[in-house]
Amino acid sequence: MKIDAKMSAWILPIHIYALLIPLILIPMIVQNESFLDGRIFQKHFFFYAVFFLMAGSLFEICQNHLDEWYVTDDSASGNGYSLFDGLFSFSILVGQCIILYGLIGNISLVKYLCLFLILIMPFIYYKKILPFLPLTIIGFANTISAYFLFEQVVIFLQFFSIALTVIFFNKLIQTENQFYHGLTTLCASSGIVFLYLAIELSANG
């Protein structure tokens, strides 16, 4: 099946938003350079994270195009799997790992955790053994680390956006109403906004 013009006008701009939203980190890093130097391990790693997060969104767009933007339980964009969908999940994981390393990479355990999750991700994705577990672990670690570094409760809205992502994705699979496709993408990609706000508020608030 294909989405109609009205649904296209809702879904496609949100995917462009998801592709471009990581770029908000770049001016924030430049403007708060000295602040970040005193708070986190390596600020320049955020630039690499932006690349991988955008690459992940691009792979997702490619897979959605192959699925004609109509997500079902059987489609690769839903609960199925494919090369592009796997690259999407892997790239997002790498981007999140790089953010965590940039925040607290001076802790040896963080390096080993990130390496371990990156190595096992392709296997558990292919086998469908808790495929969201690595992203859940690294997302939780990022949020908690950012809170202790920047002391801004706004960062906990990342948990809210994750919860909404799960709710809307499940509704999408159950109903095949593609309106939830847009909501899922919007919530899933907006977590980076709360990291941006936490750093801005901590540096300039």
Q: What are the roles of these predicted feature ranges?
A:
Residues 15-28, 88-103, 137-145, 186-202:
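Hydrophobic cores of alpha-helical transmembrane segments in multi-pass inner/ER membrane proteins
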Residues 31-46, 76, 102-110, 147-154, ...:
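Membrane-interface helix-boundary motifs at transmembrane edges
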Residues 72-87, 132-138, 177-186:
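Non-cytosolic membrane-interface motifs at loop->transmembrane helix junctions
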Residues 149-205:
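C-terminal transmembrane-bundle signature of multipass membrane proteins
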